[in-house]
């Protein structure tokens, strides 16, 4: 019997830096609203840096939730797939957690353990200064982040069950 590779949803960010806490916040929303199939792992990684690699290795799909640099208005949703993430020139940082995702993906490719698919669901931040709450622009984008995650899981045939009623949102840092 072959083992099914996991699908991982990874929230990345620093909850003490306003909008940079998007990833952990979105993970808490997902956990409160849905029960996930066994092969789907939902994890708040905080700011993993190069420790990202083990979470990417040998997976069917990795969905990363994070803030991303962009010229668009704060709160704009950006989706980057597979090669788009490593295609950026090295000096251009896509998130405040680099070195991190880009370098970790390159490491998994080198060791031939890279994820079959990866999707970065990012939101352009308004502020990454000190603070424990998301700005209104980024908080308003969270339902779109959740919808993008659900669309990917549905495409993969791993549909979570909606909690009725949802669990209480555990935002321990607010």
Name each region found by the language model:
Residues 21, 25, 47, 72, ...:
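Conserved active-site and cofactor/substrate-binding residues in soluble primary-metabolism enzymes
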């Amino acid at each position: 019997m072959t083992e099914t590779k996991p699908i991982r949803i990874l929230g990345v960010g620093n909850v003490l830096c306003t909008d940079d806490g998007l990833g952990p916040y979105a993970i808490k929303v997902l956990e409160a609203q849905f029960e996930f199939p066994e092969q789907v792992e939902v994890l708040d990684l905080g700011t993993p840096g190069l420790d990202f690699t083990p979470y990417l290795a040998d997976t069917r799909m990795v969905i990363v939730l994070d803030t991303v640099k962009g010229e668009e208005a704060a709160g704009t949703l950006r989706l980057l797939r597979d090669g788009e993430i490593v295609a950026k020139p090295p000096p251009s940082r896509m998130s405040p957690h680099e070195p991190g995702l880009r370098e970790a993906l390159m490491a998994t490719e080198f060791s031939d353990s890279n994820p079959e698919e990866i999707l970065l669901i990012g939101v352009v931040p308004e502020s990454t200064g000190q603070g424990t709450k998301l700005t209104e622009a980024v908080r308003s984008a969270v339902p779109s982040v959740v919808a993008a995650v659900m669309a990917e899981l549905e495409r993969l045939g791993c549909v979570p069950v909606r909690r009725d009623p949802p669990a209480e949102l555990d935002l321990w840092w607010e």
